[in-house]
Amino acid sequence: MFRPILILTILSCVLAYHQYRELKCSTPTNSIRGGPDRAECHLVLKAEELETGRPVPTGLGCWQEDHDGEEREYCDIVCPKSHTVFISYIDQGHRACFNFITYQVEKRNDEHVLWRSGKCLNSTVNYRIGCKFDDPFETQFKSDNEIFAHLRARARRV
């Protein structure tokens, strides 16, 4: 009796539905060290980490906020109700774009956002982000158009 319960418990902890995101932020000059121009970001949705993915329109899902006198840009990484979110790769080691205890991933209600500030706002940087869900991602959004509508609605709330 104990053995089947233990096996089911282990399987439920190990099994998860993975999704990946790439947040691509670039300046007109592709400066990686905080140049004069502001970077524009766009999200790429991926079912598998190394696939090409499906791009989200530039700027959709990103907004600015003040945090203790510091300007930050937050971008929704579309991992609602995920139990784990992590940065799996950053294409260059610019400390301004990858630091702090949380590595700049923040949970807000059932959503996760990645934020940038300081010199990173004016730097070209690409993040690869992993999300783990208890249920398939497709149960939350049936199509990319539903995801885009979700991001537009979030922009109106902010």
Curated annotation (Swiss-Prot):
Keyword entries, A-Z: Glycoprotein, Signal
Domain of life: Eukaryota
Residues in the signal sequence: 1-16
InterPro entries the UniProt entry points to: DUF7808
Glycosylation sites noted in the Swiss-Prot or TrEMBL record: 122
Protein name: Uncharacterized protein mtre-1
Annotated gene: mtre-1
